[in-house]
Amino acid sequence: MDRRARGLLTGLFFTGCLLILGLGVPLHDAAAVSDLFAALRVTRVATGSPIASFDLKNLEGETVRSMELAGKVVLLNFWATWCGPCKGEMPSLARLQSQFDPTQFQVVTITTDMHPQGIKQFLQHLGIDLPVLFDEREDVSRSFMVRGLPTTVLITQDGRAVGRAVGPRAWDSEESVALVRHVLEGMK
């Protein structure tokens, strides 16, 4: 083999290695992430839309501001006590939360129900300790275009919605955990 052919093959070899290594990012990541979204039936929000800011009351009557969630990955779940599928997925949301450090990842539930005592009893009965915020005027629900319950939105540390699911999911599944980890790693 002459020098020119050897040089060409060497160049192709190194180019191939760089493509395979992806300069530190595996080639399968994009496909694997798409598979996670698809497996969970979570619609990807293409551009990562910034969320609208909000101030809502929690079960204790204290105001919680969306900016307090900055720096965390957030799974925002819209639900109601009259919604059977919402109540059915609540334990899986709690199990998902238990797998992550709450300073990095937070499941936050938002309801239009206006009966804090009933919600407290419901959550205590199930042994669930998740934050509940009240959307009295449904302004936040409208800003997230909630058309059916449950609706869940996945939000990055910098406040951008990257995924949306309508209907119940098994939020403690391997795919859900992997998706949250992926977002925690900065959607690399």
Language model regions located:
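N-terminal targeting signals for export/organelle localization
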Residues: 1-53, 174, 188
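Active-site acidic short loop of glycosyltransferases
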Residues: 69-72, 102, 128-129, 146
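Hydrophobic beta-strand core positions in alpha/beta domains
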Residues: 75-77, 109, 153-154
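Conserved redox-active cysteine motifs that mediate thiol-disulfide chemistry
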Residues: 78-95
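Thiol/disulfide oxidoreductase modules built on the thioredoxin-like
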Residues: 121-129, 135-185
